[in-house]
């Protein structure tokens, strides 16, 4: 528990009806008595005069006291609810500083809550995600993380990994039993179930990252396929210049939109073709770089042309792809979704709008629309940690099932635990904590 006491304005600065100032730390009882002449009963709002050192009133408002450990930070917390004027707030903060409370750093209240065991790191990050949410779906996902859905799923997986690791290490200690244990089909079953559980968690976290950050979709295809027209149709705005001249789009054009509350970042790119001029070649290079970072690529082509081989355009093979056949109004084909094997395709007309509702429904579906209530908020660092854990779990499986190498398997399982623990903050560094909490608001 911290030895210093901190304070900060918890509401937005400026003029308003009410300003909330938060104080946390061991000096809270003394500060309350010096400021208002008394320490309120825990969790009861009382009307109080907030006075300066000479006894003159600085403001009048409500005061609440939350004793440790049952407070947001796990420390003694005092909350002052006064009038929302800049001068009033400034005078109160200067009085608190004089009484020994230091100005809080951004996110320091949440950091103390984490360090004092009031929440794990996913819950602390969810506070910032909830504040920054720009859609109902992302707000709901952040709330589920704040309630512990993500952290609980990680801890359940860690518990199962730990049990298997204990079994492996016990077998190593009794070398005459090690081979029999490692050869047991039940061990292969356990590690297989762990791999499946981890993959399911990665899938959910990936959806959660999309809900938090938005899905990045790149419009790709040959020149004059209608990429810019489709961007304008999706955004319902003339964002992109559209002409009949091939190669009109030379640079990336980014637009942000919501489809029924689901955040989407759409990037229009230069047409992909051989023998471009020097400027167009740079546009194509940027298009390929954008595709490599995308969550999904929409491969757009004229429906009257033969289906394009993605490999012929050197599209990234590891990025999910949806085919969009444009200009259906110029053909005898029916608009809407179609499927060839595992491939999803949708016929549309960016000009007339037919087929666009089906495309929007498809984008909503791949973003997890309708399932948002079961998702939690996730960040890129979470996905990276889960990927590292999956790599080590695969190595542990090989050591256990194929190589009968118990000591190697035990070490790989330890690394799985460590990487999962980085998500919840069980294993972390001061640099990581500083990076996370520095992005928070002051007063949070």
Swiss-Prot record:
A GO BP entry: tRNA methylation
Cofactor(s) needed for function: K(+)
Superkingdom classification of source: Bacteria
Broad EC category: hydrolase
Binding site for (6S)-5-formyl-5,6,7,8-tetrahydrofolate: 22, 79, 118, 444
Binding site for K(+): 224, 243, 245, 248
GO cellular component, one term: cytosol
InterPro entries documented for this protein: G_TrmE, GTP-bd, GTP-bd_TrmE_N, GTPase_MnmE, MnmE_dom2, MnmE_helical, P-loop_NTPase, Small_GTP-bd
Positions contributing to Mg(2+) binding: 228, 249
Positions annotated to bind GTP: 224-229, 243-249, 268-271
UniProt GO MF annotations: GTP binding; GTPase activity; metal ion binding
EC numbers: 3.6.-.-
Occurrences of domain TrmE-type G (ranges): 214-368
Keywords: Cytoplasm, GTP-binding, Hydrolase, Magnesium, Metal-binding, Nucleotide-binding, Potassium, tRNA processing
Cofactor: how bound: Binds 1 potassium ion per subunit.
Location of this chain's protein in the cell: Cytoplasm
Family named by the database record: Belongs to the TRAFAC class TrmE-Era-EngA-EngB-Septin-like GTPase superfamily. TrmE GTPase family.
Function: Exhibits a very high intrinsic GTPase hydrolysis rate. Involved in the addition of a carboxymethylaminomethyl (cmnm) group at the wobble position (U34) of certain tRNAs, forming tRNA-cmnm(5)s(2)U34.
Subunit structure: Homodimer. Heterotetramer of two MnmE and two MnmG subunits.
HAMAP family: GTPase_MnmE (MF_00379)
Name of the protein described by the UniProt record: tRNA modification GTPase MnmE
Gene that encodes the chain: mnmE
């Amino acid at each position: 528990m911290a030895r210093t006491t901190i304070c900060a304005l918890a509401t937005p600065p400026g003029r308003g009806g009410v300003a909330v100032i938060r104080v946390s730390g061991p000096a809270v009882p003394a500060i309350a008595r010096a400021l208002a002449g008394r320490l309120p009963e825990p969790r009861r709002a009382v009307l109080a005069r907030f006075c300066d050192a000479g006894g003159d009133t600085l403001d009048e408002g409500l005061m609440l006291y939350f004793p440790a450990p049952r407070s947001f930070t796990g420390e003694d917390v005092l909350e002052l609810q006064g009038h929302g004027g800049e001068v009033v707030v400034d005078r109160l903060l200067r009085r608190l500083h004089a009484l020994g409370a230091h100005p809080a750093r951004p996110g320091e209240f949440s950091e103390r809550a984490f360090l004092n065991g009031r929440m794990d790191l996913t819950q602390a990050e969810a506070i910032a995600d909830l504040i920054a949410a720009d859609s109902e779906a992302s707000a709901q996902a952040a709330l589920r993380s704040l309630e512990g859905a993500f952290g609980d799923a990680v801890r359940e997986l860690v518990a199962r990994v730990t049990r298997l690791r204990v079994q492996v290490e016990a077998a190593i200690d009794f070398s005459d039993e090690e081979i029999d244990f490692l050869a047991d089909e039940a061990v292969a079953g356990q590690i297989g179930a762990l791999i499946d559980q981890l993959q399911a968690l990665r899938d959910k976290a990936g959806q959660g990252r999309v809900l938090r950050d938005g899905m990045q979709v790149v419009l790709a295809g040959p020149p004059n396929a209608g990429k810019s027209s489709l961007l304008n149709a999706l955004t319902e705005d003339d964002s992109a210049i559209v002409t009949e001249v091939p190669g009109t789009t030379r640079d990336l054009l980014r637009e942000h939109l919501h489809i029924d509350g689901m955040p989407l970042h759409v990037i229009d790119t230069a047409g992909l073709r051989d023998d471009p001029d020097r400027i167009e070649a740079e546009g194509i290079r940027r298009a390929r770089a954008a595709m490599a970072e995308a969550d999904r690529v929409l491969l757009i082509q004229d429906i009257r042309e033969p289906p394009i081989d993605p490999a012929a355009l050197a599209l990234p093979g590891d990025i999910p792809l949806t085919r969009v056949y444009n200009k259906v109004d110029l053909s005898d084909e029916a608009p809407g979704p179609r499927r060839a094997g595992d491939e999803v395709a949708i016929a549309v007309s960016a000009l007339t709008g037919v087929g666009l509702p089906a495309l929007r429904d498809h984008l909503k579906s791949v973003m997890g629309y309708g399932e948002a209530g079961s998702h939690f908020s996730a960040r890129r660092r979470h996905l990276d940690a889960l990927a590292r854990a999956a790599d080590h779990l695969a190595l542990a499986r090989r050591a256990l099932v194929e190589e009968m190498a118990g000591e190697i398997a035990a070490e790989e399982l330890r690394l799985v635990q460590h990487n999962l623990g980085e998500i919840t903050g069980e294993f972390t560094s001061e640099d990581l904590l500083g990076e996370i909490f520095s992005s928070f608001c002051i007063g949070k």
